[in-house]
């Protein structure tokens, strides 16, 4: 129990499972950092070579593309820290700080994965010249979803911290539930956006999408990961609706089956798929398609810009 007599856990956290997931997320985070660095450097050289033959194209800077994966990396290490502090709690369930850290970190880490998914999808649609196929204006698409993601993150973080005290546990639970429902709402809208994007693209393909098919596999990977986060968030929302004495909160296996495992599968999909389908590859294919379109006389929109960042900035003026 905590100092005020409030019982932090309804069970004693399993040490073995906590260690396993701590190691899995730590190794995954390090592995992805290495992959990201390798493919960023490789893509920069490749794009530089392509641009020599036709420099006036629509493109992203390498740092901007790599930046879409940064929240994902933070998510891996935040998840790692969360499970590491569950190891601490397994030895003494009355310690308050480990409880707060593991609660908050395990709650908010999926919002970091979500931020990367939003940004990768937005960049992919822009490189495909298919912004008009999204359900909201391209300039605001990623921003709106990320704002919702940040709002969800803050509510869950604040609520998770408040749950450590008996006097604020109920209010904290309500905040976490609200944050989870915001996440569910935005993610539900985003999944609809992804699915509609696939159907619209099949009926109205762009010059990039008809020349290369990598974007389809990247979008499928993003869609699968989106469903993993959605399922996890729904279960966690039910947990907090049931309350402290509910079925889910009273049994640790729910945390691993419906939170730890789905989030590790998400991370695994990112890592395994990355060498084959990533935003750097879409970027290179977009440049090649633009060059081919210009050389063979195909009509191609918005090519006469030096970068996507400058193009979008000019449109907002």
Curated annotation (Swiss-Prot):
Signal found in the keyword field: no
Q: Could you list this entry's UniProt keywords, alphabetically sorted.
A: Membrane, Transmembrane, Transmembrane helix
One Gene Ontology cellular component term attached to this UniProt record is: plasma membrane
Compartments where found = Membrane
Segments on the Extracellular face: 1-16, 86-99, 164-178, 236-259
How this chain sits in the membrane, per its record, is: Multi-pass membrane protein
- Annotated membrane-spanning segments are 17-37, 65-85, 100-120, 143-163, 179-199, 215-235, 260-280
Q: Which InterPro entries match?
A: RTA1
Q: Spell out the Pfam families in the cross-references.
A: RTA1
The protein's superkingdom reads Eukaryota
Segments on the Cytoplasmic side according to the record's topology features: 38-64, 121-142, 200-214, 281-317
Role description? Involved in 7-aminocholesterol resistance.
| Protein family (similarity comment) | Belongs to the lipid-translocating exporter (LTE) (TC 9.A.26.1) family.
Annotated protein name in UniProt: Protein RTA1
Organism, by scientific name, is Saccharomyces cerevisiae (strain ATCC 204508 / S288c) (Baker's yeast)
Name the gene. Answer: RTA1
